[in-house]
Curated annotation (Swiss-Prot):
Example of a GO cellular component annotation carried by this entry: HslUV protease complex
Upper classification of the organism: Bacteria, Bacillati, Actinomycetota, Actinomycetes, Mycobacteriales
Name under which the protein is recorded: ATP-dependent Clp protease ATP-binding subunit ClpX
PANTHER family, sorted: ATP-DEPENDENT CLP PROTEASE ATP-BINDING SUBUNIT CLPX-LIKE, MITOCHONDRIAL, ATP-DEPENDENT CLP PROTEASE ATP-BINDING SUBUNIT CLPX-LIKE, MITOCHONDRIAL-RELATED
Naturally occurring in which organism (per UniProt): Rhodococcus erythropolis (strain PR4 / NBRC 100887)
InterPro entries xrefs: AAA+_ATPase (IPR003593), ATP-dep_Clp_protease_ClpX (IPR050052), ATPase_AAA_core (IPR003959), Clp_ATPase_C (IPR019489), Clp_protease_ATP-bd_su_ClpX (IPR004487), ClpX_bact (IPR046425), P-loop_NTPase (IPR027417), Znf_CppX_C4 (IPR010603)
Any Pfam family matching the protein: ClpB_D2-small
Top-level division of the source organism's lineage: Bacteria
Keyword Chaperone listed: yes
Gene: clpX
């Protein structure tokens, strides 16, 4: 037992040696003592170590080309969107490492502003999956929010602060780590105001939500209710700084192509105008030509667009891309279903014609890559029901007829082993 001499019975800290008179508190353990000052020091050391481990270190941060290469393993096509995202993410985390400030060539301090991203494109083309794959690569907290569930403060629905709660939960309530995470807000086109002109009546789920999102997009100290729901007095809040949170805002923006076409078409009048045939105009990716004025006409307010300086567009997937999505990425659907069948000791095979037929069906349904899984489930459901109860199946072959004509997949029976033959003849 740690004691001080001179006949006194004073206890002392086993770590710093201070007596119980020199400190506020002395906590006893089995044969050891620790003072309040040493406890504070231990807490500081732990917090520093946790903060260091949660930071994305610049020397470990992949370069834009490496980020794009990683995305290639999981996402087919969308090269322009991959490049835009790779550069935006690299610059964002480089800015965090610089502590929001850097020095230019003349040695002057320059404040580095945040560049959030707006993603445009049809449904089922990989917008959400691109963002999820990015977060997985960088090992940062990632949260997905639906803009349609949000309303202006004081009305029925979710407050914008609930988006931040999802990020904090994804970081296991480690606020420091959450402050360098990524938030993906989907369906943002659904919060466009209903007309181009500001309305006299309140638009609580449209323009009101855009106004409410402005502060957290730009960077602010937000108060988040720990259990979600509405804020009320006498409630404790989690404080989170959104300055270093990267926001990726996305939507299908149906009808925006027409607004862009009208603007581009007006430029094609008069002498010296660039004349394009109808066939050329049909093949042009209108989302790649989007300007802020088009988004304002669509119903986004100028302040909201100003906080989303980077625009990445994704295009409709053609048949070739859909076939590649089925078989080539690391988590391709064909590989996933093969693994499921493999667990039952059965081999699964798709003919090339079958993959083409599945891609054709997805194009007909207009659901993009998202519809591929639904078609695969429909095609494989009968055999996935039967196979677990049978032990005489070697292989299942899916053909084009299986997809187009609802014919059952071809079942190749398992060859009996020699021992089994002897038993039958005995």
């Amino acid at each position: 037992m740690a004691r001080i001499g001179d006949g006194g019975d004073l206890l002392k800290c086993s770590f710093c040696g201070k007596s119980q008179k020199q400190v506020k508190k002395l906590i006893a353990g089995p044969g050891v003592y620790i003072c309040d000052e040493c406890i504070d020091l231990c807490n500081e050391i732990i917090e520093e170590e946790l903060a260091e481990s949660s930071e994305v270190k610049l020397d470990e941060l992949p370069k834009p080309a490496e980020i794009r290469e990683f995305l290639e393993n999981y996402v087919i096509g969308q090269d322009s969107a991959k490049r835009t995202l790779a550069v935006a993410v690299y610059n964002h985390y480089k800015r965090i490492q610089a502590g929001d400030k850097g020095r230019d060539a003349r040695g002057e301090t320059v404040e580095l502003a945040k560049s959030n991203i707006l993603m445009l494109g049809p449904t089922g083309c990989g917008k959400t999956y691109l963002a999820q794959t990015l977060a997985k690569m960088l090992n940062v907290p990632f949260a997905i929010a639906d803009a349609t569930a949000l309303t202006e403060a004081g009305y029925v629905g979710e407050d914008v602060e609930n988006i931040l709660l999802k990020l904090i939960q994804a970081a296991d309530y480690d606020v420091k780590r959450a402050e360098t995470g990524i938030i993906y807000i989907d369906e943002v086109d659904k919060i466009a105001r209903k007309s181009e002109n500001p309305s006299i009546t309140r638009d609580v789920s449209g323009e009101g939500v855009q106004q409410a999102l402005l502060k957290i997009l730009e960077g602010t100290q937000a108060s988040v209710p720990p259990q979600g729901g509405r804020k009320h007095p006498h409630q404790e809040f989690i404080q989170i700084d959104t300055t270093n949170v990267l926001f990726i805002v996305a939507g299908a923006f149906a009808g925006l192509e027409r607004i862009v076409s009208d603007r581009v078409g007006k430029r094609g009048i008069g002498f010296g105008a660039e004349v394009r045939s109808k066939a050329e105009l049909d093949t042009v990716d209108r989302f790649a030509e989007v300007m802020p004025e088009d988004l304002i006409k669509f119903g986004l307010i100028p302040e909201f667009i100003g906080r989303l300086p980077m625009i990445a567009s994704v295009t409709n997937l053609d048949k070739e891309s859909l076939v590649q999505i089925l078989s080539e990425p690391k988590n391709a659907l064909v590989k996933q279903y093969r693994r499921l069948f493999d667990m039952d000791g059965v081999e699964l095979e798709f003919t090339e014609e079958a993959l083409d037929a599945i891609a054709d069906q997805a194009i007909l349904r207009g659901t993009g890559a998202r519809g591929l899984r639904a078609i695969m489930e429909e095609v494989l459901l009968p055999v996935m029901y039967d196979i677990p109860s049978r032990d005489d199946v070697e292989k299942v072959v899916v053909t084009a007829e299986t997809v187009n004509d609802n014919v059952l997949p071809t079942i190749v029976p398992r060859k009996p082993e020699r021992g089994e033959r002897r038993d039958k003849t005995a």
